[in-house]
Amino acid sequence: MSPSAAEIRSAYDKAKQLLLDQCVSINGQSAHWYGELSTSALSTATAMMALLQVVKAGRSARDFEINADFEQLIGGGARWLVEHQNQDGGWGDTTKSMSNISTTMLCHAVLSMVSGQWSVAGAEDAVSCAKNYIDKLGGVEAVRRRYGKDKTFSVPILTHCALAGLVDWREVSSLPFELACLPARFYAAVKLPVVSYALPALIAIGQVKHHFAPSWNPLVRWLRNRAINKSLQVLERIQPPNGGFLEAAPLTSFVTMSLVAKGLVDHVVVRRGVRFLCESVRPDGSWPIDTNLATWVTTLAINALKDDVPESLRPDLMKWLLGQQYRDVHPFTNAAPGGWAWTDLPGGVPDADDTPGAMLALYHLVQWDVPYPEDEEARERHCRKFHQNSPPVCAANDGALKWLIDLQNVDGGWPTFCRGWGTLPFDRSSPDITAHVLRAIAIRWWDCFYPESLPLNTPPHHRRAFKKSLVYTACAAAIDGFGFLAKTQRRDGSWLPLWFGNQHAQDDENPTYGTSRVLMAYRDCRRLETNEAQRGASFLASIQNPDGGWGGAAGIAPSVEETALAAEVLLDFEQYRSQAFGGIGWLINRLYDGSLTEPSPLGFYFAKLWYFERLYPLVFAVSALRRSVEVSGPEEMPS
C-alpha cells in the first residue's frame, strides 16, 4: 500500500532533520558534512605491513618525531584483524563484506609476520584458517585472475606477500617505473600498466621489485638503475604535504613498505607516509579505506535538500565549496585548474564525479531551487539574474565546465581523472560519471537553452563550429555524451556504473545504481521520452522486489541506497509512479524501524575494493523522499 501525502511529508521532515543534524563544525572549520568511511581489513593489513618494515629496519616512532608506538599500533591492528575474520577463514574489504582472495592474502601475510614476533591471542589460528581459504581459491593465480591485465592492485598485493616471505619475487610482475621520468603529458601515450591514480605505486613497487629481482635484460637493468633517483624525485613531488597519497591508507602503505624494504627508511616520502598512517589509525586499532569523502557527501547532501538547506548554513557552505576548487595544475595527475576532489584534504585529486557534484551544489545554494521557466524570454531573464546575483558561483562553474569539456574522451563519455590515459576500466569513460557531467551542464546552461537548439543529428563538423562560445561547446559536448550513453546501454535497458557494485550480484555489478544515475541525467535534460530513457525505466521497474525495495539487480535483497535511487527517478515516469511510491513506502518503513541509516557495502574504492559510507543511505533517502513530496502534492494520495 502506497503512503499518503501526509505520511510522506512527515517522513521527509524527520529524515531531513536527521541529515541536517550531521552537518557539523570540527576544529573551527565551516560546518559541513563529514560522513564516515568504512574501516577496512585491507587498509589495516597494509598499514601494519608498512610499520612492520619500519620496525624491521630498526626505526622507532621517536626517530620519526612521531608521538606513537609502532609496536602498539601493529598489535592493535593484529587484534582487530583476528576479531573480524570471517567464518570461512577469509576477510572482506569491509566488516560487511564477503571474503575475497586479495584482502585475505594481505591479512594472512601480515599476521604471519606478527605471530612469529609477538604474542597476539588467536593470531596463529587465524593464520591457519586463512591459509586454508587461500589454498582453496588458488593463491597467486586467483589474484591474477581477479584483476586480469590491470596490475594496479595485483602487483601491490603480491609485493606485500613477498615482503612477508610468502611469495617468491619472481611471481611479482615488474613495473616500468622508469616511465614516470617522462613528462606527464606522455603518460597516456605510453599506456602504463596501472591506472592514472596509481603512479606512486608504479614508482615505489617497481623499484622494490627491481631491487630484489631485477630484469634479466642488461639494457633494462641499466635503464632502471639510471631512473631510480629521478623517479624518486617525481614521487616526492607528487606526495601531498600530509603524506597520504589520495588520502588512502592502502596506497600510502604500499609506497612506504616498498621504499623501506629497499633500504630507504629515512627517505622523506617514507617519513611523511609513516606520519600519515600513525595519524589516521582509528581508536579500535583499524585503518579506514580513506580519510573522508567530506566534499562528496556535502555536495550529495546539498543536492538532496536543495532549497531546504537552512539559510544560516548557505554562506559558509558556499564559501567552503568555492575554496576547494583547484586553481593550479595538480602535481599528481597534472590536471588543469577548475575541478574539485572528493575531500578538502591535501591528498585529494580533481575528478569528473566530484566536480559536477560541486557545480550542482553551488547552483542549489544560490538558486534555492527556482522553478524552471517555461518560455524562452523567462529563461533568458532567469539566466541573467543568476549571473548578476552570484558572480563567484558563475565564474567557478564556468571554470569547472571548461575543465570537464577538456576532459571528455573521444568516445563522448567522461573518465574519472585523466582524458585518454589508458584502456584500464578506471581510466575509461563510464556511464555514471558521464551522466553526472550531463546533469551539471543541464543545470548550468539548459536552464536558458533548449537541447533542441543543437539537434541530435547535427553533423560533427557543424558541432565544432559551436565552440565559439561556452554554451554551444557545452551543448555539443552534451550531445556527444548522450551518444555515449546510447552506445553503452545494455540490451536489457540498463547501464553499469564504474564506482559502485553489489557483492551479491553477478560479476559484482550494480545495474540498479548505474541505471538510476543515468536516468537522472535524462530527467534533468528533459529527455525522458527518448527510447533509451524508456528502456532504462522499464528495466528498473522490472527488477523491483515484491516488498517494494530494490537491490543491485533482479532477485537481490534490497538496500536503502538502491531503493532510494530507483524510486526517486521512477517518480518522474508516470507509468511507473505507483511502483516508485511502493519504494517510498519501503523507505518510510525503514525510517521508523530504525534501519534507514544502515549502510551497505556498495561503493568501489578503486579496483574492486569495497567500501561503505555512513551517510549514503540517509542522503539518498532524503533525496527520494523530497522528490516524492513534490510529486504527491500537499493533499493528493499517491495511487
Regions found by a protein language model. Give the residues of each.
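Surface-exposed extracellular loop regions of Gram-negative outer-membrane beta-barrel proteins
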Residues: 271-282
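Extended, basic/acidic-rich, low-complexity regulatory helices/tails in eukaryotic proteins
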Residues: 98, 638-639
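Intrinsically disordered, low-complexity segments enriched in serine/proline and basic residues
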Residues: 380-386, 466
